[in-house]
Amino acid sequence: TPRRQGRVTLNPLAHLDPLGTILIIFMAFSGYGIGWGKPVPVNPGYFRSPRRDWVMCAFWGPLSNIILAVIFAIPLRVMLASGERLPDSVFVDFILSMVLANIGLAIFNMIPLHPLDGSKVLSGALPDIYDRRYWNFQMVYGPIILFGSILILPLIGLPNPLRFILLPAREFLVDLLLGI
């Protein structure tokens, strides 16, 4: 459990995944920002309805990002409601960065490729026969498709197909939150 692993803390060091941390540092120099933290351990033995509860558990991460984006968007929305342009300031830049980052994380994590949360949400929505096939496929090919799309394709000069999903969805949600 997270408590046994010393992860019930606000200390970010407790949540760093060694490979994810090294990769984000390395990738920052290449212009890509990809990395990850340790996944939150989940004990399905506590689930009353395992299939439904896996979906709910997977959905909470992206939902928490949306909630944070809404909270950070409130001051920007208030400023925009005054009819004035947003001032150029570190505060506004920080708040806008938090809105963009949290919306981006929510959308990215809902992509239905393993190990992202969207794979668990889709898996729970599928009938049992398709769920097993989907899950078997995702366990093997999900990470390959995901990392190939993010890392390999751009390195060989091809566009990342996930951008065609992520950027329009992020733009739509930012416009919705900020009332633009």
Where are these regions (language model features)?
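Hydrophobic transmembrane alpha-helices and their immediate loop junctions
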Residues: 1-180
